């Protein structure tokens, strides 16, 4: 390790992507398995640092990324950190992301929804924010509920083959199957 960036000029979007992936796919499984430890401390600090760098102004407030994979990773991380720690910052960040992707924009208006790894994270992340809202913020839940339901219903309508397996990607507006390959991470979406 050189303790240097791979590029001469660091790219904040790339750094945020790497941090979100590391937090969700690297640190979260460890802290969920062993509980409080240096791994949890690392995840908490990494998440705080990501939100300190939030550079995208949205109607919901500043968020670290407009990319649905990154936002989905961060939704899952902040939701679980909130349940684990009770720290209101994580709850606020999760709701800020969910507000942006459920209330101020809609995945149903996009040209593509990925239903496999590197795209479907937003679906699970939004569902985790919905669980949190249903428990802690009933008014927010009432606004989220029809939108998450419409998203999940549309995925079932256009995103599955006759056997109920998910395609890799679909256009939610037109119903066009963009990638007929079958998602090997279907459980992520069906867990939502």
PLM features per residue range, with description:
Residues 1-192:
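Glycan-recognition and catalytic cores of secretory/periplasmic carbohydrate-active enzymes
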């Amino acid at each position: 390790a050189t303790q240097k960036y791979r590029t001469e000029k660091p790219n904040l979007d790339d750094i945020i992507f790497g941090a979100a992936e590391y937090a969700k796919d690297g640190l979260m499984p460890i802290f969920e398995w062993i509980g409080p430890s240096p791994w949890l401390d690392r995840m908490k600090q990494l998440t705080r640092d990501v939100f300190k760098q939030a550079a995208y102004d949205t109607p919901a407030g500043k968020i670290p990324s407009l990319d649905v994979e990154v936002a989905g990773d961060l939704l899952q991380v902040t939701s679980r950190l909130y349940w684990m720690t009770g720290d209101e910052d994580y709850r606020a960040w999760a709701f800020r992301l969910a507000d942006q992707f459920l209330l101020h924009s809609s995945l149903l208006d996009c040209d593509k929804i990925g239903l496999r790894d590197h795209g479907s994270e937003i679906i699970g992340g939004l569902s985790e924010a919905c669980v949190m809202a249903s428990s802690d913020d009933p008014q927010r839940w009432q606004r989220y509920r029809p939108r998450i339901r419409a998203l999940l219903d549309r995925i079932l309508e256009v995103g599955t083959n006759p056997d109920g397996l998910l395609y890799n990607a679909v256009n939610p507006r037109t119903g066009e199957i963009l990638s007929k390959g079958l998602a090997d991470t279907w459980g992520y979406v069906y867990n939502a």
